[in-house]
């Protein structure tokens, strides 16, 4: 067997293994998360202790949906979009909660991460407009719902900002952090705080998504996530090229998703290491 045939045979074996392993690994990972949930509880939506577990639970649903799309719908396009979203989620978790060694840096990133999305939502708020097709009562309810939504977002924003300004890190790096929380920034992807305040948000001090993908250490897949799958996410021209949704092509996507799932479980086990030790000890 020549080298080319050996490589093709190895790829076929990997694809075949993925179809066998994927549902089993997913079922086992859900079991792992269930055990973890029983041990630590769910916490609030912005609790730094339980938030990574919440994200992992959400991703198991996405992994399940991906399996159904590949096996039943054979939708190559949607499969790519879901995998890219999964990669984005895991890359964010990895940067915020694992790559960061210092606890206060981790807390800072966590709060900035939420502030970034909250500020975006607040900036896109649109209040209902009264017209003849809606009653005064219905309009009042819609208006109250929107006001309540804004109120809740503002309360969460104030809590997050308060968390940041009470960090010891805020005392030692006040100017830098003030730049990070300046309206329009909330830069949770900063590389270092030990830099001139005026340069804290410069592109040379910000992790790109491509760099964040590389931190997952999935053997060059950062190019696949950042370039190839971007075509599907954004509906670019090359995403409309016909690719046969056969077992081999879909299997390649499944093997990448399986690698992401394994990476996510490793991350969760590392982040909750002491909790898993308790789980193991309780089973003895």
Predicted feature locations:
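Short, glycine/acidic-rich hinge or "gate" loops at secondary-structure transitions
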Residues: 79, 97-109, 276-281
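Intrinsically disordered, low-complexity acidic/Ser/Thr-rich segments used as protein-protein interaction/activation
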Residues: 83, 103-114, 120-124, 128
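Secondary-shell segments that build the walls of catalytic and ion/ligand-binding clefts
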Residues: 2-50, 61, 116-284
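Amphipathic alpha-helical scaffolding segments
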Residues: 81-88, 103-104, 110, 245-254
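Long, hydrophobic/aromatic-enriched structural stretches that serve as scaffold segments
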Residues: 41-100
């Amino acid at each position: 067997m020549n080298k080319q045939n050996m490589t093709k045979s190895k790829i076929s074996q990997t694809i075949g293994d993925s179809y066998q392993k994927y549902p089993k690994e997913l079922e086992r990972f859900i079991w792992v998360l269930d055990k973890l949930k029983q041990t630590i509880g769910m916490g609030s939506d912005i609790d730094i202790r339980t938030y990574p577990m919440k994200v992992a639970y959400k991703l198991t649903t996405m992994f399940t949906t991906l399996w159904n799309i590949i096996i039943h719908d054979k939708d190559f396009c949607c499969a790519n979009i879901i995998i890219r979203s999964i990669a984005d989620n895991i890359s964010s978790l990895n940067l915020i909660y694992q790559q960061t060694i210092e606890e206060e840096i981790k807390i800072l990133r966590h709060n900035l991460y939420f502030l970034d999305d909250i500020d975006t939502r607040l900036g896109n708020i649109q209040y209902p407009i009264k017209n003849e097709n809606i009653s005064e009562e219905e309009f009042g309810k819609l208006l109250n719902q929107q006001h309540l939504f804004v109120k809740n977002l503002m309360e969460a924003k104030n809590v997050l900002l308060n968390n940041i300004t009470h960090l010891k890190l805020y005392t030692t790096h006040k100017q830098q952090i003030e730049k990070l929380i300046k309206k329009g920034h909330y830069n949770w992807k900063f590389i270092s705080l030990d830099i001139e305040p005026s340069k804290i948000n410069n592109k040379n001090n910000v992790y790109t998504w491509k760099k964040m993908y590389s931190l997952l250490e999935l053997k060059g897949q950062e190019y696949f996530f950042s370039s190839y799958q971007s075509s599907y996410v954004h509906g670019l021209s090359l995403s409309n090229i016909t690719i046969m949704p056969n077992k081999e092509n879909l299997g390649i996507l499944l093997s990448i998703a399986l690698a992401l799932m394994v990476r996510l479980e490793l991350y969760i086990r590392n982040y909750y290491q002491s909790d898993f030790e308790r789980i193991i000890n309780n089973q003895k």
